[in-house]
Amino acid sequence: MENDFSSSACLELEDRIDVFVKKCSLEDKNFLIELERKYRLEEVVINQKEEDDKIIHFVLSKALTTQCIFCAMKIENGKLFAVAKAGTNAQGKNYFQLGGVFCREEFRNRRIAFFVIQHLLQFIHSCGKKASLFVKVKNEPAKKLYKNLGFTETGKYGISYFQKQ
């Protein structure tokens, strides 16, 4: 996958909307926890009653130590917080799989997720890997975003959920 990412384009975005994009580490967990909570409730969790802070902290800590996560951060009223994130959720021989892509609702449609993913794609390319991802069939905004980033649809997939009775 070709990626014509230029850091000057990202800096232009960062100057315009007062955010910066960074590669995250475990030290960033406290800044990311609320964004991870919103992501999991909107995109991942089937039964919201079963989700709790211990699970969110565990999943985020594991991702920050075993995967690659980039986020867009913003300072507002003297407080730093994450507005968007994108990361890998699987790393194979030839491909890194993107996952956990999420942007706070009030920051959507500003190309923030686009630039966060571009940072991630640049990192993936620097590792000599290609990128792949899955997207829900009805998630048209995400499909448009990924198409604008150069992704092409290669097939359909389904998720089966199992629950112990």
Residue ranges, per PLM feature:
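Acyl-donor-binding surface of acyltransferase catalytic domains
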Residues: 1-17, 160
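Short amphipathic alpha-helix that is part of the acyltransferase structural core
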Residues: 10-49
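Conserved beta-hairpin
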Residues: 60-61, 66-86
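A conserved beta-turn-beta hairpin within the catalytic core of GNAT-like acetyltransferases
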Residues: 90-98, 108
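Conserved acetyl-CoA-binding loop-helix of GNAT-fold acetyltransferases
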Residues: 100-103, 109-126, 143-148
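Conserved GNAT acetyl-CoA-binding A-motif
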Residues: 124-135
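Conserved beta-strand-loop-alpha-helix junction that forms the acyl-donor binding cleft
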Residues: 133-147, 159-165
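A secondary-structure capping/hinge motif
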Residues: 153-156
